[in-house]
Amino acid sequence: MSNLWNSFEVYNKKKHSSQPGMRGGNHSNVGDTRTTVQYASERYERRGSTASESSTTSNEETPQMVDISKLSQNEFKRLYESTRKGEPNNRVNF
């Protein structure tokens, strides 16, 4: 009869590891008992790379804020297609 009530226990010791180093509750440092904190002075800026430079140039091609009421139909269509580029097709066919 005791086996039936074991499944309703809040903390079942048999479900968890017996190794004390593997108890990582509310932090991602599973092997450590404390959460590591990184202060703002310890943060380093990223180095310039070709990948980050190419992403900044691609952002310059498409304007971020555009007044849609002042665009012609062709300009709006070109802008609309450029923003949807690479977006998955989520159509559902019945």
UniProtKB/Swiss-Prot annotation:
InterPro entries, per the entry: Spg4
Biased composition (Polar residues): 26-39
Biased composition (Low complexity): 49-62
Annotated region (Disordered), positions in chain: 13-73
Family to which this protein belongs: Belongs to the SPG4 family.
Function, in words: Stationary phase-essential protein not required for growth on nonfermentable carbon sources.
Protein's recorded name: Stationary phase protein 4
Organism in which the protein naturally occurs: Zygosaccharomyces rouxii (strain ATCC 2623 / CBS 732 / NBRC 1130 / NCYC 568 / NRRL Y-229)
